[in-house]
Amino acid sequence: APRKCDIAAMNLIRNAAVYARLVKVEHTLFALPFALSALCLADICGAAFGLREILLCVAAFTAARSAAMGFNRIADREFDAKNPRTKNRPSATGEISPRAMSAFTAASAAAFVACAYFINTACFILSFPALAVLFGYSYAKRFTAAAHYFLGLALSLAPAGAWIAASGSLDPRILALSGALFFGIA
């Protein structure tokens, strides 16, 4: 018979896989290079940062995206259940309860803000409007045909945020990468 610790480990792995499907972790891995590219550009331009900032940027990016995806799944749960393309999402099937999604989203948002706090003051202050933009997309798509501009803006924050994490300020040189990402999505 399986031991309790074996069952607990299997449940933990199963739950992690469900949450990874909820936030489409593969898309997080696809989008992360935009933030990492900004760190490389900041390094080339002379910003002084180290492994600590790199790891905090990766953690902040992952937490912010998880919060945004969790919020979007909560907002769209009823729509997703009726849509053939999205009806099998864990949020639509009930595999994850709305309460659990809310807790996950809140924890992810808190982790993002905490990472931003430990990076620098500018990142911490900007983490709140960044979350507003990330969460705003979930409702913008219901009220405007320009929702892709909202999504483009949300995604373009990653390189700008990484630059600010590396240098402590926003520099016009990073706006080219953020702008390309914005217009590439929008």
Each predicted region: which residue ranges?
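Hydrophobic cores of alpha-helical transmembrane segments in multi-pass inner/ER membrane proteins
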Residues: 34, 159-162, 183-186
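The first (N-terminal) embedded transmembrane alpha-helix
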Residues: 24-42, 152
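Intramembrane alpha-helical segments
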Residues: 12, 17-21, 89-174
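Residue-level micro-sites within transmembrane alpha helices that shape
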Residues: 23-26, 52, 64, 72, ...
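Short, positively charged and aromatic/hydrophobic N-terminal segments
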Residues: 6-7
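Membrane-embedded alpha-helical segments that form the functional core of polytopic membrane enzymes
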Residues: 37, 41-75, 85, 109-117, ...
